From Swiss-Prot:
Assembly: Acetyl-CoA carboxylase is a heterohexamer composed of biotin carboxyl carrier protein (AccB), biotin carboxylase (AccC) and two subunits each of ACCase subunit alpha (AccA) and ACCase subunit beta (AccD).
Lineage of producing organism: Bacteria, Pseudomonadati, Pseudomonadota, Alphaproteobacteria, Hyphomicrobiales
Species of provenance: Chelativorans sp. (strain BNC1)
Keyword annotations of the record: ATP-binding, Cytoplasm, Fatty acid biosynthesis, Fatty acid metabolism, Lipid biosynthesis, Lipid metabolism, Nucleotide-binding, Transferase
Limits of the CoA carboxyltransferase N-terminal domain: 25-294
SUPFAM superfamilies per UniProt: ClpP/crotonase (SSF52096)
Gene: accD
Subcellular location: Cytoplasm
Protein name from the UniProt record: Acetyl-coenzyme A carboxylase carboxyl transferase subunit beta
Reaction(s) catalysed (UniProt annotation): N(6)-carboxybiotinyl-L-lysyl-[protein] + acetyl-CoA = N(6)-biotinyl-L-lysyl-[protein] + malonyl-CoA
NCBIfam families: accD (TIGR00515)
Amino acid sequence: MNWITNYVRPKINSMLGRREMPENLWIKDPESGEMVFHKDLEENQWVVPASGYHIKISAKDRLKHFFDNGAYETLENPKAGVDPLKFRDERRYIDRLRDAKAKTNLDDAVVNAIGRIEGLEILATVQDFAFMGGSLGMAAGEAIVRGFETAVERRLPLVLFAASGGARMQEGILSLMQLPRTTVAVDRLKEAGLPYIVVLTNPTTGGVTASYAMLGDVHIAEPGALIGFAGPRVIEQTIREKLPEGFQRAEYLKEHGMVDMVVSRLEMKATIARLLKILLKEQATEENGSRRLPAPEAAVVEAAVNA
């Protein structure tokens, strides 16, 4: 063996050899099949530039694009019981939780954050579908209630981005208890005269649609979002009939009066800021820290009359 064998040949092989490319460098558009560079998607809020298809977005990416200059303060989620039923199916529930936390770097499926949009201070509650399908368990329920309580304490409007497959089956009845708890939290926000806007993203299904996700003053849906209690396949198998084209999709629900508007993720921030200014009856500024808040119902009626 000599220096050519030991040093030169490996160098040449490393320079000319086939290089492995990261698997997630290019992402396929589910609608058109087009391959899109992941950096372009990140910059475009995970909306495919050509087709407008909305790819699922993480809670952290959504907050970064939603708040002014990407600046916000996250609230610490309250502690909740872990695996109270010692549940196990194909895997232990506690193992699924551990994997979800490692995958998303989140404590659970809900993130609360306070920041400004067009100078207006708000509280945003975001569900991350990557964490066990955004399912609603005790920890997620506690986080949602904490978000509403903080909004009332600090006199802030609340914007909730729903993304969930429904109640977390591994927690049984303890998961279902979060439906009335979150509903009561919404009522307290409304009693305080604070606006509540819900953004329904893909998908928003199950018990989430039977509670806080459908109790907003204004309901906005992202294009193509699946929204409903039971999924379309379950309904078809139950009624033994073919459902209409686009059934339970955002555009279909808009046509049938279930949501107020369908808005692209790229226009979401501006749309919500405009709605909140109407509900709060004032123009938001960077310096304005205090405001007199009318009841949402009165503000909505006035806005409709004057439109």
